[in-house]
Amino acid sequence: MRLPRGVGDAAELRKSLKPLLEKRRRARINESLSQLKGLVLPLLGAETSRYSKLEKADILEMTVRFLREQPASVCSTEAPGSLDSYLEGYRACLARLARVLPACSVLEPAVSARLLEHLRQRTVSGGPPSLTPASASAPAPSPPVPPPSSLGLWRPW
C-alpha cells in the first residue's frame, strides 16, 4: 500500500531540509559562542588574541565562572546608590507636580496644597514608601447611605 502523493512529498521535503536546518542551528550556536567569548574575555581581563582558539566548553565555563562572581559585587555596590536614585526621582517628580498641580482645575486649592505637603513629608522621612496598603492603616470612609424613600421601589410594570 502506497502513501498518498502529498504525504510522501512532505516526508521527502522534511528529509532533505533536515541537514540544512541542522547546519543553520550549528552556525547560530557558533556565532553566539563567538559573541559570548568577545563579551566575557575583556570582562575577565584576558587578552582576546591569546584565547583565539578556545573550545566551546571553555567559553561556557568562563562565562559561568564570571556570572557566579557577579552577584556578590553587584549587590554590595548597588544598594546605597539605588536609594539615592529613588529619592532623586521622587524629588524631581514632586517638583514637577508642584508646578502642574496648582493649575489643575480638578482639585480644590486646599486639597492640592494638602497633597503637596503630604508628598513633601514623604521626602523628609526618606526612603521609598512601604508596600502596605493604605487601607490597613486607616479605614476607608464609607459612602453615605441614602435615606429610605417613602415612595417605595420603582417598577417598570
From Swiss-Prot:
InterPro entries attached to this UniProt entry: bHLH_dom, HES_HEY, HLH_DNA-bd_sf, Orange_dom
UniProt-listed PROSITE patterns: BHLH, ORANGE
Biased composition (Pro residues): 140-149
GO cellular component: nucleus
Gene Ontology terms for molecular function: DNA-binding transcription repressor activity, RNA polymerase II-specific; double-stranded DNA binding; protein dimerization activity; RNA polymerase II cis-regulatory region sequence-specific DNA binding; sequence-specific double-stranded DNA binding
Position of sequence motif WRPW motif: 154-157
GO biological process, one term: regulation of neurogenesis
Region feature Disordered, mapped onto this chain: 124-157
Subcellular location: Nucleus
Entry keyword set: DNA-binding, Nucleus, Repressor, Transcription, Transcription regulation
UniProt KW DNA-binding keyword: yes
Pfam families (UniProt xref): Hairy_orange, HLH
Domain Orange per the UniProt entry, residue ranges: 86-119
bHLH domain segment(s): 13-70
Low complexity bias spans: 125-139
Highest taxon listed in the record's lineage: Eukaryota
Domain notes: Has a particular type of basic domain (presence of a helix-interrupting proline) that binds to the N-box (CACNAG), rather than the canonical E-box (CANNTG). The C-terminal WRPW motif is a transcriptional repression domain necessary for the interaction with Groucho/TLE family members, transcriptional corepressors recruited to specific target DNA by Hairy-related proteins.
Quaternary structure (record): Transcription repression requires formation of a complex with a corepressor protein of the Groucho/TLE family.
Name of the featured protein: Transcription factor HES-2
